[in-house]
């Protein structure tokens, strides 16, 4: 997908542009650019105008890929608070069913580190 062309098409339409940024973030992550992915996801969240359910776990994935493990775990804890099903392996697997293998593995790695960390 040509994201520059999609962004040009969506200009002035935040309802469309937020989807462009969200997808662009995943594409950048797939290309090994987690910092850029996070920036695109932040833009998508800003255009969303609220607290999108996907922001905590996508931030966790991007930060994990940047080796910012503690911050990634803090974001994953926020994801669990907003989506309690992510507190289980089954919930994580259900979320990532249609994801790419490396994306799913990253989420599983974050989950395993979070689950192993003492709570409280």
Protein language model features and the residues they cover:
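Short helix-adjacent coil turns
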Residues: 32, 66-68
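Residue-level recognition of tetratricopeptide repeat
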Residues: 26, 57-61
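Terminal, low-structured helical/coil segments at or just beyond the last alpha-helical repeat
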Residues: 78-120
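Boundary/linker segments of alpha-helical solenoid repeat arrays
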Residues: 11-16, 48-56, 81-95
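Alpha-helical adaptor scaffolds
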Residues: 2-53
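Conserved positions within tetratricopeptide repeat
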Residues: 1, 38-39, 70-77, 104-111
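Secondary-structure boundary elements
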Residues: 49, 68-70
């Amino acid at each position: 997908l040509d994201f520059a062309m999609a962004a040009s098409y969506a200009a002035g339409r935040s309802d469309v542009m937020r989807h462009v940024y969200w997808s662009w973030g995943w594409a950048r992550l797939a290309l090994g650019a987690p910092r850029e992915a996070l920036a695109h996801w932040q833009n998508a969240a800003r255009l969303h105008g609220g607290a999108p359910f996907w922001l905590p776990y996508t931030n966790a994935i991007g930060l994990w890929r940047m080796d910012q493990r503690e911050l990634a775990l803090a974001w994953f804890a926020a994801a669990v608070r907003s989506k309690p099903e992510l507190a289980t392996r089954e919930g994580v697997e259900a979320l990532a069913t249609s994801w790419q293998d490396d994306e799913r593995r990253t989420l599983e790695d974050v989950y395993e580190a979070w689950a192993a960390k003492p709570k409280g």
